[in-house]
């Protein structure tokens, strides 16, 4: 066997193992999720909901997100966050990849509601912007981890996603880990994980 083929084989093996073990906040491959609610599916013109809807919406965003995958990988390494989860969050927050929605402080729980703003997709090109989103998510996960130290890493991830979306006081028990944002993001993240993220 030629050394070149051996080297290429080793690179392929290390690349696949790297992408399957990303992140300090749970294993998205093992998480079960119902996916997007029917409300989310209808919002985007789908006649179905659940994992199928989340996967379809992720599929629509995938070509755009692929262009920014190096940024997500870099930020993922910096914050020990699976790039597939970052892609899932960005996909959920950017309908069809056409624009990014900023709903102000709705998720912060501070009671301040700002005017809805739409940013062009070029905002995603910024490593700083992706870092800010990821830092906010990891801070939410760490806060949940501090409040509920006996929970599993998967529960911390779910709680962090719900807190990221609904504010830190939304999660009061493990009954609050089934929010629509979390379910949809995890289904999209699993799709992205299976498609190279």
Swiss-Prot record:
Enzyme class: hydrolase
Alphabetical UniProt keywords: Disulfide bond, Glycosidase, Hydrolase, Secreted, Signal
Annotated GO CC locations: extracellular region
Catalytic residues (UniProt): 93
Enzyme Commission numbers on file: 3.2.1.-
Disulfide bonds: 24-80, 38-49
Entry's localization field: Secreted
Signal peptide: 1-19
Similarity comment text for this entry: Belongs to the glycosyl hydrolase 23 family.
Protein name: Lysozyme g-like protein 1
Species for this entry: Mus musculus (Mouse)
Taxonomy of the source species: Eukaryota, Metazoa, Chordata, Craniata, Vertebrata
